[in-house]
Amino acid sequence: MVNAPIKLLIAASGTGGHLFPAIALAEKLPDYEIEWLGVPNRLETQLVPKQYPLNTIAVEGFQQGLGLSSLVILGKLIGSILKVRRLLKQGNFQGVVTTGGYIAGPAVIAARSLGLPVIFHESNALPGKVTRFFGPWCSVVALGFDVAAKYLPRATNVCVGTPVRSQFLNLSNNSQLDLAIPGGVPVIVVFGGSQGAVAVNQLVRQAAPAWFEAGAYVVHLTGDRDPDVDSLKHPQYIELPFYDNMAALLQRASLAISRSGAGSLTELAVCGTPAILIPYPFAAEDHQSYNAEVFTKAGAALSFKQSALTAELLQNQVLNLLQSPPELAKMGENAKAIAVPDSADKLAVLVREVVER
């Protein structure tokens, strides 16, 4: 008699930072029957249904204070917990994995109420409020950065790194860039994560002319909400909302200018790309600054608060680095040293240990 496959529910929603690691994990569990838990009208509705059945619940975060809107949210939360509990019970799931965010709460509560194991992956150096609250409820919290452990004293945790998309696993096999960039020229790649970064885009456009004069090409991934798109034209300036083959692009880059979301940093590290980091100032609890600190302490990046960064300062920092190839090379080596390229494998092993014990 053939054993039925283990059923696993993955609760991951919102941005690429939550979704890409979860998808990378799922691909390492081909013998599992996996379903997804997400939120309507979020990125997962575009990425997940091609590979896994997607179940959705309505859930959102609480604002400060306890007003009518918070009571409405509380009502939705209770309804979501009951819906997830019913899904887990009727589907005979044997475990839950979550990558955090608002969706983690209903998933963890529902799973633990049924006695199911929960693996929580936290990619940030400063764990989010949801992780800090629900971490002790979980079987184990898998960490992207080991410095996060000090914020989770009551949770069982292990550092496995943050899984990257499959294109980053075989870097030598990446196809050539289909961009009009000659060989041997410095390339600056600018990106703001899966949502773009309007403020960074504005600084870059003001600073870029001096970089062109220095012979550099700029590949600027603006996101799809940039109001100033097409405002800068230059033969050495390539402007795109997104670019699919990020692994090849970051390998070609001499330098990246980026936000410091955990997913972006993980990809920079795997590719050994030196970076100038501009933490998103409105991130919850300023957690992107904690992520950036890991890289600056390791000598893999420079970091600047957005409020203190001018176009002139950014312009000069980039020019100084371009004029010092040995420094860029050392930063790239330091970034590589942070990377955990087999993170998805390590997380998959952890999931198997917890779910199958």
From Swiss-Prot:
Catalytic activity as recorded in UniProt: di-trans,octa-cis-undecaprenyl diphospho-N-acetyl-alpha-D-muramoyl-L-alanyl-D-glutamyl-meso-2,6-diaminopimeloyl-D-alanyl-D-alanine + UDP-N-acetyl-alpha-D-glucosamine = di-trans,octa-cis-undecaprenyl diphospho-[N-acetyl-alpha-D-glucosaminyl-(1->4)]-N-acetyl-alpha-D-muramoyl-L-alanyl-D-glutamyl-meso-2,6-diaminopimeloyl-D-alanyl-D-alanine + UDP + H(+)
InterPro entries: GlcNAc_MurG, Glyco_trans_28_C, GlycoTrans_28_N
GN (gene name): murG
Main function: Cell wall formation. Catalyzes the transfer of a GlcNAc subunit on undecaprenyl-pyrophosphoryl-MurNAc-pentapeptide (lipid intermediate I) to form undecaprenyl-pyrophosphoryl-MurNAc-(pentapeptide)GlcNAc (lipid intermediate II).
Primary residence: membrane
Protein name from the UniProt record: UDP-N-acetylglucosamine--N-acetylmuramyl-(pentapeptide) pyrophosphoryl-undecaprenol N-acetylglucosamine transferase
Keywords: Cell cycle, Cell division, Cell inner membrane, Cell membrane, Cell shape, Cell wall biogenesis/degradation, Glycosyltransferase, Membrane, Peptidoglycan synthesis, Transferase
Pathway assigned in UniProt: Cell wall biogenesis; peptidoglycan biosynthesis
List of residues binding UDP-N-acetyl-alpha-D-glucosamine: 15-17, 124, 165, 194, 288
